[in-house]
């Protein structure tokens, strides 16, 4: 039975927590930080993977709007009229934003060809903005008045129907548009992305004329390949003291409520140790459901570890970390080349550390943080950029337990204020006679406060700076890393060799006694697929730059294999 170390018995730990930690703190804090960083990175990658694949299926518009194209000259005509005002009207308020789009052509002489030219210009602007069934018409008028009037006739959605009505799906939860709404391509694409984010589900859309003028019927053909999907994974991303080789099982359950919802579960465990006192395991569950332009997601996980420590007498160090996160994402703006969303999160974590089944009460943590952010995806030629800018703040509420000494006398605090930037840029590059791919991934956090180890930024390992094993890391209250990778896909053989160079840097009050602040590493590897179910990634990394005295292997092998079913 575990015994909790109460406050009266932990005075020594409490008085030295902010300056010179005891042996117990030395053993557990760095390790938990390292393991928590690895677990958080893997959870983040699993959460992002399905959405990334769905979004990349979108195609860009070939239309160029007036705002992004150079202004074209009016055609010269013998019969023309002086026009001082160009008026654009519509029965729908959404088109009021176009009322000044042609004002640059005012105070010119315009004839019949000029009217047709301007009508075409405005029509192309509507197409570029996604109003693919709305029309620009020229009503009867007298140009001697000095005014030229265009009218935008809105195109509407008459109905949205499933071509296979027996499909286990509700399109209303995915699409931010209903019958009677003005038809806009971006709203339909948002619904398609929401439906494609469901594993094993694909959708094709056609727009057909409706039964009334300027009305269209949107037909959806949904292909569903089962409602349960899974994968088995094996890698060597673990720690020597708790299990280098990690095995994982992932299961996803789609359409439980028929709302394009997804329940994802995973179980990860070391397969290196059995009954020798070492080991680690992790459970994770997440559930997401769309609501048109909004997506709700809740996730929870629990991570635990055991290890034997010899300092100099043997004892068992163990710990648990569990967390719950609730997130809401709202699309703010979507064009043919970009999507911008607002994100809000509430994050709660609990951590407990033990020595020989005795809980170190002073190290127990119950923390809560709120986060707001902006995410942006941009398409530019053959380049796709994803950026997420966030602000996160620890709060004293919603289950958090804040101690009175936090933040005093250089002690760390859970009531931190932090900003961060993360994302990736992917673009095609020529490599000899073949088309290659360059990818830059980056992540950062910035604060001027001293943080607990589990909130610090960690570098060194496959999830940050490759070329390092992750057994030893550099940590700081603030930091960043950038991963650069050049890949050359051989699509016929389903093999992609790659080479990478990564850099990371940390700083802040907690780095005062650290060996250094910067790591640079390199990696060469190959990833690919075998058939439709097996994926693999094998690489060899090496340190390029590290602080003197920083202990790490000169060659770091990494592998990951998975089987999908």
Describe these PLM feature segments.
Residues 25-238, 268-281, 441-443:
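Periplasmic polypeptide-binding modules associated with outer-membrane biogenesis and secretion
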Residues 180, 235-237, 270-273, 310-315, ...:
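Extracellular loop and loop/strand-boundary signature of outer-membrane beta-barrel proteins
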Residues 214, 243-247, 279-283, 320-324, ...:
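Residues that define the transmembrane beta-barrel architecture of outer-membrane proteins
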């Amino acid at each position: 039975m575990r015994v909790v170390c109460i406050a009266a018995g932990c005075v020594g730990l409490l008085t030295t927590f902010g300056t010179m930690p005891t042996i117990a703190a030395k053993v557990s804090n760095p390790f938990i930080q390292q393991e928590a960083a690895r677990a958080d990175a893997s959870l983040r990658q699993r959460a992002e993977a399905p959405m990334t694949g769905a979004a990349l299926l979108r195609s860009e518009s070939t239309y160029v709007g007036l705002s992004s194209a150079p202004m074209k000259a009016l055609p010269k005509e013998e019969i023309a009229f002086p026009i001082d005002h160009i008026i654009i009207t519509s029965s729908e308020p959404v088109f009021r934003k176009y009322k000044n789009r042609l004002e640059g052509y005012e105070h010119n002489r315009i004839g019949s060809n000029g009217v047709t030219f301007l009508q075409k210009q405005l029509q192309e602007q509507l197409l570029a903005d996604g109003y693919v069934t709305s029309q620009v018409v020229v009503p009867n008028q007298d140009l001697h008045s000095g005014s030229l009037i265009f009218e935008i006739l809105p195109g509407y959605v008459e109905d949205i129907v499933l071509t296979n009505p027996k499909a286990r799906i509700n399109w209303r939860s995915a699409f931010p548009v209903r019958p009677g709404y003005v038809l806009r391509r971006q709203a339909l694409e948002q619904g398609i992305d929401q439906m494609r984010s469901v594993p094993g589900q694909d959708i094709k859309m056609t727009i057909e004329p409706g039964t009334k003028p300027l009305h269209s019927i949107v037909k959806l053909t949904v292909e569903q390949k089962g409602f349960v999907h899974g994968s088995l994974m094996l890698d060597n991303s673990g720690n020597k003291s708790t299990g280098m080789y990690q095995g994982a099982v992932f299961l996803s359950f789609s359409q439980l409520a028929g709302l394009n919802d997804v329940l994802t579960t995973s179980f990860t465990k070391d397969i290196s140790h059995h009954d020798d006192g070492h080991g680690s395991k992790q459970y994770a569950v997440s559930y997401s459901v769309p609501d048109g332009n909004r997506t709700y997601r809740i996730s929870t996980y629990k991570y635990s570890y055991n290890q034997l420590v010899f300092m100099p007498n043997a004892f068992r160090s163990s710990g648990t970390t569990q967390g719950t996160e609730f997130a809401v994402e709202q699309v703010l703006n979507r064009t043919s080349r970009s999507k911008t969303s607002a994100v809000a999160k509430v994050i709660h974590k609990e951590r407990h550390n033990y020595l020989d089944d005795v809980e170190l009460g002073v190290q127990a943590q119950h923390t809560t943080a709120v986060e707001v952010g902006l995410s942006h995806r941009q398409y530019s030629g053959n380049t796709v950029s994803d950026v997420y800018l966030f602000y996160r703040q620890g709060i004293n509420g919603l289950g958090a337990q804040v101690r009175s000494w936090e933040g005093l006398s250089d002690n760390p605090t859970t009531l931190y204020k932090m900003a961060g930037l993360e994302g990736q840029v992917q673009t095609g590059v020529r490599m000899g006679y073949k088309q290659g791919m360059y990818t830059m991934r980056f992540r950062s956090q910035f604060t001027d406060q001293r943080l607990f180890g589990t909130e610090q930024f960690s570098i060194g390992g496959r999830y940050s700076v490759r070329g390092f094993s992750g057994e030893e890391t550099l940590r700081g209250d603030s930091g960043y890393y950038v991963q650069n990778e050049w890949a050359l896909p051989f699509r016929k053989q389903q093999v992609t060799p790659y080479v990478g160079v990564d850099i990371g840097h940390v700083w802040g009050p907690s780095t005062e006694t650290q060996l250094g602040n910067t790591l640079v590493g390199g990696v060469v590897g190959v990833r690919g697929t075998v058939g439709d179910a097996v994926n693999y990634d094998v690489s060899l990394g090496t340190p390029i730059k590290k602080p003197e005295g920083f202990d790490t292997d000169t060659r770091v092998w990494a592998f990951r294999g998975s089987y999908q079913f």
